[in-house]
């Protein structure tokens, strides 16, 4: 669910994971049964704004098929990994519900929200780019696309642009935009 995912957000992290098909059911069970409750606890206690587990539909990458989005008001909240302790929250040892052994690839990126229009939606398109002029790209999105979408979302229910804060290397994107829709 993408609804309101970035409401009041200033920062977000995306954890990309590659889960082999034979591990998907157990991965989804552990994430939706246990880790979603840890995230809910963090949201209710003001440690983050939102959490989402999404699966990829189509696309050109074979390096990930699931992603976690954690949304925060501050960079300090985003950096505080101590809040992800299922032992203190659920009374369950982290090793009992770990999904690390079910994945064959993992990567985390951290982002700053530069502009967004809130709304609901069950599906999203993520666009990753590495523009030659990052500042101009963000400025164009803030001053041209944001106001244009405020007038006519063109079927979108949510839109935004974020700047990457880590993994800034030649082969990686430095910016992403997202467009949410009611369904795929």
Predicted regions and their residues:
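Short S/T/G/P-rich N-terminal loop/turn motif that feeds into the first structured element of a domain
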Residues: 9-184
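Bacterial Sec-dependent N-terminal signal peptides
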Residues: 1-11
